[in-house]
Amino acid sequence: MVRKITKTNPNLIKLIRNLRKKSSQEGAAIWKDVARRLERPTRNRAAVNISKINRHSDEDETVLVPGKVLGSGNLDHRVQVVALSFSQTARDKIERAGGECLTLGKIVEENPAIKNIKIIE
């Protein structure tokens, strides 16, 4: 018999439910995909460094990380980063480059029908 593993973080559970709900209401499949990625075990969740965001993004682009953004590397252009969480050094480097750090819950409420977003894992 397979053991079902459930999330114990109530904020994450609420976020996943909200993402699924917005996906069906707005017809935006991206939120369903992000919810599925967040349901993975913690050890399989994305942890992305600033250097990877720098390599795979362009000026004034929106990047979504379904996990944590870490502060290793440099960012040389302005980018809007949406993630589950940020390390303090990552937040400082993004803001120093003129970018913006947003949480997943905030972006889903403000702009549920978002377009032109790049997912980086």
From Swiss-Prot:
GO terms for biological process: translation. InterPro entries: Ribosomal_eL18, Ribosomal_eL18_arc, Ribosomal_uL15/eL18, Ribosomal_uL15/eL18_sf, Ribosomal_uL15_CS. GO terms for molecular function: RNA binding; structural constituent of ribosome. Keywords: Ribonucleoprotein, Ribosomal protein. It holds the Pfam family Ribosomal_L18. GO terms for cellular component: cytosolic large ribosomal subunit. Belongs to the eukaryotic ribosomal protein eL18 family. This is Large ribosomal subunit protein eL18.
